[in-house]
């Protein structure tokens, strides 16, 4: 039996896990790292890059690179890369395809089945789009699991809590979910969920970038896409620096801007006040839905990379009136939980008795007549939010008027009284024979499965007619044949080979730093990159050593750029910056530096 892979398909980063050796194990990518940036780029030759190299291209080729597309899953938004347009689910499929390749390389066998996590507040269209993305990437999607549920599984598996009431605060790059979880015996019961699908760490990046632009007296509309890409990247670096320090220097070096300014945590609190306000709303909602007070929560668990921000932790400590807030590997915990779920699906003896009960995060219903205002249709709720999954409920309705011959069943998701304020999911047109309305009952059943996908059944007892539909975005829905055709199409896409991935990353990283620097340092970077290209082209026995050398060299240059340090030429030119653990490795570095100098003399004269 092939392994089932658990996947955290994130807004900023994605990663995978597998149940192995009686535990959930993270799967490394080609760099030996667990986090793969959820970024896709296409070059002039139509070759697709996914992950670290694609992320570097955000600054150098912003119009050929896409990120944060998870926020638009289930919509018809298009990203134009290379010579074609991609839907968010197609870009996600490329990320999932990359994770599949990494998993197969790590396990040494083919894998086909996956469990993919989604934000609890993803609507039905986004969930269906996620499932299609997995299928297009070549996966058989065993289950769609809510991210907080996966996090709860990981926590329960790690801590073996006998009884606890947890609040899981899942704050990632692009989404926020807040859940109440009841743990007892081997049961994990999700009690209530609330969230915001358009709030995440990326919003802090955007606000820091906006603050910097205004402080420099610039107009964002006059800046090139390349410059905006550099500013956003520097804003993210500034945010990360503020994780460790009270203040951070934000430095932007590129053709249009050469400036630096200090930003403090207090500054972020002030200009991101709206973000913190939005963070508080789901917390209040989930406590109300769970009929529970702050004092009754035994554990608060932080999930998602954005929870590493001290300001987020301080805000939660204030709102929840406690200081014992846990961060259990925020970047990895969802993937680890998906790995546990994979172990349960495989019936592994260590976890086969664990039971996860999930809930429906939204209310679902249909539009009905509003006698008080015929123009404004009301929402008739069939499934209320926080109902346990799987869940099925039937309501009986009647036509609007006597002798009506057609009924339009309009299906909505949301909590508002009026359907105009809720999300339209789909519509069923039903033909009925003319009769008195009281003699023409229409039975409507909603069934919400464990993947959070809605199925609607309609029965007309008077005629025996039955209609059924699975809610999908009709504009984007695909038949099985269309999915298979798309799978074959994606198999033909030229992906950057895994063996070239590190080389491409070094080139993209170096190209971005080259663009950010000026003068002698820029020339030095350019020549190092030319030398690296030379070594790659001839596939020399030195290549691995040169890769290692370039990674350290570019890391030092990155530090110089970020800190706005004005170093002397010798600080970066003589190789003394390269520190290694052993004398042998230090000697290796000197040899590579000498080889570079010899190559440089042969290819550049003194006048350049």
Put a short name on every predicted segment.
Residues 1-75, 79-85, 94, 101-608:
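Oxyanion-binding/catalytic loops of NTP- or PPi-dependent enzymes
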């Amino acid at each position: 039996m092939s392994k089932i892979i658990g996947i955290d398909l994130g807004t900023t980063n994605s990663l995978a896990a597998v149940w192995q050796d009686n535990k959930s194990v993270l799967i490394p990518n080609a760099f030996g790292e667990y986090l793969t940036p959820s970024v896709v780029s296409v070059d002039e030759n139509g070759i697709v890059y996914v992950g670290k190299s694609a992320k570097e291209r955000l600054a150098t080729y912003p119009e050929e690179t896409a990120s944060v597309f998870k926020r638009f899953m289930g919509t018809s938004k298009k990203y134009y890369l290379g010579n074609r347009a991609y839907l968010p689910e197609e870009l996600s499929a490329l990320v999932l395809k990359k994770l599949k390749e990494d998993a197969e390389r790590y396990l040494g066998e083919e894998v086909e089945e996956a469990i993919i996590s989604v934000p609890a507040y993803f609507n039905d269209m986004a969930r269906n789009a996620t499932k299609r993305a997995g299928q297009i990437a070549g996966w058989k999607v065993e289950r769609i699991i809510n991210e907080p549920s996966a996090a709860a599984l990981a926590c329960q598996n790690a801590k073996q809590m006998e009884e606890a009431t947890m609040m899981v605060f899942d704050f990632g790059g692009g989404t926020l979910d807040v859940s109440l979880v009841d743990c007892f015996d081997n049961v994990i019961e999700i009690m209530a969920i609330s969230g915001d699908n358009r709030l995440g760490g990326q919003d802090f990046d955007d606000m820091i970038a906006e603050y910097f632009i205004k402080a420099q007296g610039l107009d964002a509309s006059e800046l090139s896409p390349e410059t905006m890409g550099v500013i956003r990247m520097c804003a993210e670096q500034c945010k990360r620096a503020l994780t460790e320090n009270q203040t951070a220097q934000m430095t932007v070096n590129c053709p249009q801007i050469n400036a630096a300014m200090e930003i403090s945590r207090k500054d972020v609190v002030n200009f991101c006040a709206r973000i913190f306000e939005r963070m508080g709303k789901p917390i209040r909602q989930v406590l109300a839905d769970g009929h529970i007070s702050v004092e009754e929560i035994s554990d608060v668990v932080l999930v998602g990379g954005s929870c590493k921000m001290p300001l987020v932790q301080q805000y939660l400590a204030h709102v929840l009136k406690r200081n014992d807030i846990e961060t259990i590997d925020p970047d990895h915990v969802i993937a680890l939980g998906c790995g546990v779920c994979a172990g349960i699906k495989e019936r592994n003896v260590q976890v086969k008795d664990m039971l996860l009960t999930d809930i429906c995060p939204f209310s679902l219903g249909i539009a009905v007549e509003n006698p008080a205002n015929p123009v404004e249709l009301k929402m008739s709720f069939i499934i209320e939010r926080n109902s346990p999954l799987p869940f099925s409920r039937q309501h009986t309705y009647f036509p609007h008027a006597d002798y009506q011959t057609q009924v339009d069943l309009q299906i909505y998701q949301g909590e508002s009284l009026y359907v105009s304020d809720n999300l339209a999911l789909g519509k069923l047109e039903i033909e009925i024979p003319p009769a008195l309305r009281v003699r023409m009952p229409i039975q409507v059943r909603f069934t919400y499965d464990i993947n959070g996908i809605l199925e609607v059944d309609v029965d007309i007892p008077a005629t025996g007619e039955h209609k059924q539909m699975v809610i999908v975005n009709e504009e984007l829905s695909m038949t099985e044949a269309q999915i298979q055709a798309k799978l074959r199409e994606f198999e033909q896409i030229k992906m950057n080979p895994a063996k070239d991935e590190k080389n491409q990353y070094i080139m993209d990283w170096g190209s971005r730093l080259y663009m950010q620097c000026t003068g002698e340092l820029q020339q030095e970077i350019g020549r190092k990159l030319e030398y690296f290209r030379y070594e790659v082209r001839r596939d020399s026995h030195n290549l691995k050593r040169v890769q290692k050398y370039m990674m350290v060299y570019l890391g030092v240059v990155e530090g110089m750029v970020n800190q706005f340090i004005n170093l002397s030429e010798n600080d970066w030119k003589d190789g003394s910056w390269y520190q290694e653990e052993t004398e042998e490795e230090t000697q290796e570095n000197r040899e590579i530096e000498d080889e570079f100098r010899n190559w440089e003399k042969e290819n550049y004269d003194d006048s350049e």
